[in-house]
Amino acid sequence: MKIPLKWLKEYLPTDIQPAELAERMTMAGTEVAVLNSHKDKWPNVYVGQIMEVNRHPNADRLVLVKVDWGQGQETVVTGAPNCKVGDKVVFARTGAVLIDGHNGKEIVLKPAVLRGVESCGMVCSERELGLSDEHEGILVLPADALVGMLASEYLGEVILDLELTPNRGDLMCVTGVARELGALIDRLPAISDPDFKATGPDIKEKIEIEINNSKLCTRYTASLIEGIKLGESPDWLKERLIACGMRPINNVVDATNYVMLEFGQPLHAFDYDQIKSRHIIVRPAAEGEVLTTLDGVERKLSPDMLLITEPDRIIALAGVMGGENTEVTEKTSRILLESATFDKQSIRKTARGLKLQSEASARFEKGLSYELAPIALKRATQLILEIAGGQAASGLIDVLPNKKERNGIVLSLAKVNQILGYEKEPPDACKIAKRLGFIWLPEYVPGMEEFGYGATEDMVRIYPGYWRMDIETDIDMIEEVARIAGYHTIPCLPLDKAIPKIETPPLPGMKRFLRQILSGYGFQELISYSFTSREMLSRVSSGAEPEFLAISNPMSSEQEVMRTSLRPSLYASLAANRRFEKDGLRLYELGRVYLPKENKKQEEPEMLCAVIAGGSSQSRWQRNTAGFDFFDVKGIVESMVSRLGLSADFVVSDEHGLSHGYQAGILVGDMPVGILGQVSPQTADKFDITEPVYMFEINLSKLITRAMVRRKFNPINRFPAVERDLALVIDRHITNRQVIDILSEYDLVKNAELFDMYQGKQIAENKKSLAYHLLFQSDTHTLKDEEVDGVMSQILGRLNTETGAVLRS
């Protein structure tokens, strides 16, 4: 938000230097930078004075102007009709950077010979300086302009550039900044209630206003001005609009923009003669309605948008932009001026839904008090009468369906000191409230003493100004006390107790640990948007149409739904990065997915998904060209889960998107927590992946419930272990997991590890050989061979009964 300092001083006269002023406001919570509106512009451009004006010897429409620019005199050839001896003008020397009056592009001024006469410079118009589109004549400066001064210094103005926080919509205008600065320097700004002289008929005879939804439009005020003359605004008004970053258009539109910058209330002018019905209705849009706005674009409307209409047609998008059908044009002689208060959520949805952000919508989105509407309307009417002429109808249209009484905020002065930490000489909260323009009264609240907030005489009721919509509770008011008194006045006190130890929540702690583990395994983390497209998710979904959580106002078609899986972003990233990575690539992502449910709620589990592709070794000397396989990713999962203090088991699975026979479900205890396997060629092809890719996916929201189980300490076994090897011939369809499950049921078997598998000529065609290394150990005594032999016999018998396995000879 840009505010000219001269304009600000009209409401709050002060001798404070701009840098100090900016420092005070910055330290009070609003960052301010001091700018010069024309600093570093117009090199070699000076204030000059016309000494002579002579006719051009070879051209009737050109004149020779001799200009004194403080360091000498130069002769300039110009066709400007308003050159007079003694006038102060803007003189540009050779090398100056100006705007070409014909095409609007920047040019570097060079020496020129015009009709046989050398021109050493230029006397400039407003357009050539970039101040406006005016180029019919040169810019004539006031008589007090100092000859020889740089034009950037003379025409420049100190501008305050405010970086506003979302809650301070009141600072989006000059009067709001004046109130803020006035509170900081303890001086009330001179802001009076405007009014205008009405000489026309009663406005109620000319127009009828109706509000159909008082929640979306809390107040609608309007005035009528007849006999206006549309034209260019005066220079002072145009200069202020330009300094604030706005483009002058015509005197009526400029007046509404000026008042918006002055008071913060957006206004809109309708061509009254185009409102044929003389009846305005404020209502929500109906499905399928359209409106051509002032920018000439036909816009499709939705029911959550608020409209200004006649009974049979739409004439404006409330709070955002007017309609082309009631636009003020050169033929306009009567205008209806609107100043209304619209619901901020409604305006935000409309502006974003139509991608139509404006200065007006930005102010409505922050929230405006309905008390501001008639004040700004009177000021705008007054200004238009001043610069565009005409007669104002008597009175105002003021539709206020539900007037709300302000209850004020009950504040304990003791609580102010308690919250801010003052012990001696605390700031006077009542005086600060007065400096802010608020009203305060003594308050009696029975029973507050028992809460430690002070006796009856300690309580006050504060009524914030209507412009401070962000002051709602006593804590808000306490913040104002700290801001205005100065944060530097709050005493620094030593801690009176130890800082409590806050334990890291289990899930964030697990995620941090997993990042460390995966980083050690050579993985790189991917962070993608939670928003994605239906098309992207459908690539990893089964044939049935999947359900998604749709976003009501997506930024683009590629971010229209919430993700239900991390796989698409990982596969797409893998495909994009494999072109630049010759060795193996390992990627993972930690994040939530959003799963819709029938009861219109949703699950948001925290997931870990990882992919690996390429060579399994990056060591150049090793020259290992073997690629990753199923057992690599299985080993990573086993090791990772083991480092969490858990044990992973694997079961046969049939997950869509993974190759049949090269996938497995992940169990921790008896709980399914994830899946791993090779990405199917069909799915890989959808992401333009041409090589084998392996992945694993784990539901951390489930895994954490197992990791949180407190584990008991087991002492180191002091009895020796006995090792045996067991080679079995077994049917090919029997899995290693089935054998391991049987072996693990025997207490003396502490570990069983598959170390060999064979299929070949020496074994029947439908059989295979599995060889296991078994570790036997007792917790209470040293095992004897007879005891181990007995357990081995039991194992062989059970394996034979349940799987048909026999001991390999």
Swiss-Prot record:
GO terms for cellular component: phenylalanine-tRNA ligase complex. Transmembrane segments: none annotated. Residues 404-492 form the B5 domain. Binds 2 magnesium ions per tetramer. The keyword Cell cycle does not apply. GO terms for molecular function: ATP binding; magnesium ion binding; phenylalanine-tRNA ligase activity; tRNA binding. Mg(2+) binds at D470, D476, E479, E480. Its main location: cytoplasm. Residues 39-152 form the tRNA-binding domain. Its cofactor is Mg(2+). Residues 717-808 form the FDX-ACB domain. NCBIfam families: pheT_bact. Tetramer of two alpha and two beta subunits. This is Phenylalanine--tRNA ligase beta subunit. It comes from Dehalococcoides mccartyi (strain CBDB1).
